[in-house]
Amino acid sequence: MIERSQDEPEAFAELFDRHSAAVHRYVARRLGTQAADDLMADTFAAAFQQRHRYDTGRADARPWLFGIATNLVGRHRRAEARRFRALSRLPAPVDHGQGVAELATARADAFLVGHRLAAALAALPARHRDVLLLIAWAELSYEETARALAVPVGTVRSRLSRARGTLREALGGSDPTVLREAPDHA
């Protein structure tokens, strides 16, 4: 398809139709929906301009596109880190309604974990955050992530391990999806 677009530029539209929603979702989760529209368009514009450099021996263009998107996100990294830091400083909402105690506790715990997670994401080195978010949000495999970032698969594995360790430590060393039981005071 990319090779064909060298002679028939309109053939590139198939690549856009196939992958634009996934690229948009990934960028939206990294930078917000407003920036996602622009960066998704910029990703495909850059891909179109660079299509002569694409390795046509590769069956799937997804890693290449996510690599371009990640590089564009890199230009916005400082704003992304500021956004995560700002989220971590938001005050907890006050719920004046009467709800079930367990629901209120669960919501408060989730809110606090969200703030700690945002702060931890902001504190991650960009190279670790990129690997983590390509795997978690873009749902790329280790191999696809390696191709997207032009690094060996072993580097992806080590960066992911370090990112997960840092997040685990920032979240108190436990899985944030598991509710903590109150100790029995018998």
What is the role of each PLM region?
Residues 83-110, 114:
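Internal acidic/polar
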Residues 16-34, 49-50, 121, 173:
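Amphipathic, Lys/Arg- and hydrophobic-enriched alpha-helical face
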Residues 85, 119, 147-148, 164-186:
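C-terminal edge and immediately downstream basic/flexible tail or linker adjoining helix-turn-helix-like DNA-binding
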Residues 38-45, 59-71:
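Structural recognition of an alpha-helix C-terminal capping motif at a helix-to-coil junction
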Residues 119-130, 138-155, 169:
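Helix-turn-helix DNA-binding module
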Residues 1-22, 184-186:
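N-terminal module of bacterial RNA polymerase sigma factors
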Residues 6-14, 24-42, 56:
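Short, charged helix-capping/linker segments at alpha-helix termini
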Residues 49-56, 67-89, 110, 162:
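Arg/Lys-rich amphipathic alpha helix in sigma70-family domain 2
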